[in-house]
Design a protein with these regions (language model features):
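A short helix/loop element that forms part of the nucleotide-sugar donor recognition site in Leloir-type
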Residues: 55, 207-220, 277, 393-396
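Carbohydrate-associated surface elements
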Residues: 180, 201
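Nucleotide-activated donor-binding/catalytic signature segment of Leloir-type glycosyltransferases, i.e.
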Residues: 61-64, 273-289
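A conserved mid-protein helix/loop that constitutes part of the nucleotide-sugar donor-binding site
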Residues: 17-25, 225, 229-251, 256, ...
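A conserved, positively charged/aromatic
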Residues: 143-144, 149-179
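Short hydrophobic beta-strand element within catalytic cores of glycosyltransferases
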Residues: 326-329, 339
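Conserved acidic donor-binding segment of nucleotide-sugar-dependent glycosyltransferases
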Residues: 340-342, 346-353, 362-367
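Aromatic "clamp/platform" in nucleotide-sugar-dependent glycosyltransferases that forms part
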Residues: 290, 309
Length: 401
């Protein structure tokens, strides 16, 4: 009987996002005869309707261990405040002191708990889901354990020289979700032999949602052109640029019948709603909040917009392409890898609101362009980004000894 690898999957995230969905798609399909996986999270976070990640994992036969995170203690807060006062003359010194305090109260205890779980569970591999900067305690635990460590880098990483040194010393392999993410790793000094790319992917055979049904639910007429975006309402997603561009579009085409549907939740929601009011487009913008089935909402769109400052390889772009919805995206890592400008979608330089507005205009006014972009993108996603390729690619890395 072949050796079954016993894997502890560490995810330090606090909310349900695209990386969570990609992880779940892998776990649903991974070969259980070869890989015995237990998840270790810092929070049993939930989706909008209350279903927790633990419940979803239990439904597919994957156990979950939660390491509860305590609030920052008073002594740590006071130490940081004292450090800021005493080290007022040096920003770098203040940052270093703050980090030292965080290591004492947060990182070291987590390292100890991960190390204990790993030993008690008899695991042979620590597999981490996100990026090195948010998985640092995993690297430190693996160093103590001298364990095999696989990093799945799902977004464009933020790397510092000390972090790169840690990665180079202790990582066995780093899986990048796009060639762009791998390029960023290499540019920051991560050893080339550690890096490999396994493209994010989607299930191209999944049932497709009913476009008309969701439009009726949102009270959107058939003749209304729907722009839309899906994702956390956070600064990195740059939805404020999208609203600015839509205001320009609306001024240029006051006769246009359109809506903008923002699917997602986050700290920017109130500011975005106020921005829409200030721009005079509040009646055109629909905030749905977080949704368990964003794919159903995506089907209502006539054009999908992703204006992010950075991405890994956004699954939602692949899903839009599968639904024959043309994509307008910022020219950043990940997104630009999926879109060949004017062939499989439209690109604009990040933060270039005028060019984004022009792209909105082009998609809205030119039905032939819309159809051509959507058809080419559909062919590309079916040929290159099928979920089977993603699963086999990750299995090959996890199974290599």
């Amino acid at each position: 009987m072949p050796h079954k690898s016993k894997i502890l999957l560490l995810d330090t995230g606090k909310e349900w996002g695209g990386g969570t969905n990609s992880m779940l798609e892998l776990l649903k399909r991974i070969n259980r005869d070869e890989f015995d996986i237990t998840c270790c999270f810092y929070s049993d976070y939930s989706r909008a309707e209350g279903e927790t990640i633990g419940q979803v994992l239990n439904g597919i036969g994957i156990p979950l261990i939660v390491i509860p995170q305590r609030q920052q203690p008073i002594w740590a807060k006071l130490l940081k405040e004292a450090g800021r006062s005493l080290l007022f003359f040096s920003r770098s010194a203040r940052k270093a002191f703050t980090r030292h305090v965080d290591i004492m109260w947060r990182i070291r205890p987590n390292v100890s708990k991960i190390e204990t779980l790993f030993k008690q569970g008899g695991f042979d591999t620590l597999y981490m889901n996100n990026q090195p900067g948010s998985n640092e305690e995993g690297y430190l635990a693996a160093a103590k354990l001298q364990a095999r460590l696989i990093q799945h880098c799902r977004i464009e990483p933020v790397l510092t020289p000390p972090l790169v040194k840690l990665v180079n010393a202790h990582a066995t392999k780093i899986i990048a979700v796009s060639h762009g993410v791998e390029r960023v790793l290499l540019e920051h000094g991560v050893r080339p032999e550690l890096c490999t790319t396994v493209n994010n992917a989607i299930d191209i055979h999944q049932p497709l949602p009913d476009r008309r049904a969701m439009r009726q639910r949102l009270n959107i007429d058939d003749d209304t052109f729907v722009f839309g975006s899906i994702g956390s309402l956070i600064p990195r997603k740059a939805n404020h640029h999208t609203l600015d561009a839509l205001a320009q579009f609306s001024q240029k085409h006051p006769e246009a019948k359109w809506k903008m549907v923002l699917v997602g939740e986050g700290g920017e929601r109130r500011a975005l709603a106020e921005q829409a009011r200030a721009l005079g487009i509040e009646h055109n913008v629909i905030f749905t909040g977080f949704q368990n089935t964003p794919f159903d909402y995506l089907a209502t769109f006539d054009a999908f917009i992703l204006a992010s400052k950075s991405e890994g390889l956004p699954r939602v772009v692949l899903e839009a392409m599968l639904l024959n919805i043309p994509v307008i995206g910022s020219q950043v890592t990940g997104t630009a890898e999926l879109i060949d400008h004017d062939s499989t979608g439209l690109l604009f330089p990040w933060s270039d609101v005028s060019q984004l507005a022009q792209n909105l205009d082009n998609i809205w006014s030119d039905a032939d362009l819309l159809a051509r972009l959507a058809a080419a993108a559909y062919q590309n996603v079916c040929h290159t980004y099928a979920i089977e390729n993603y699963v086999s690619g990750v299995e090959a890395v996890l199974g290599a000894h």
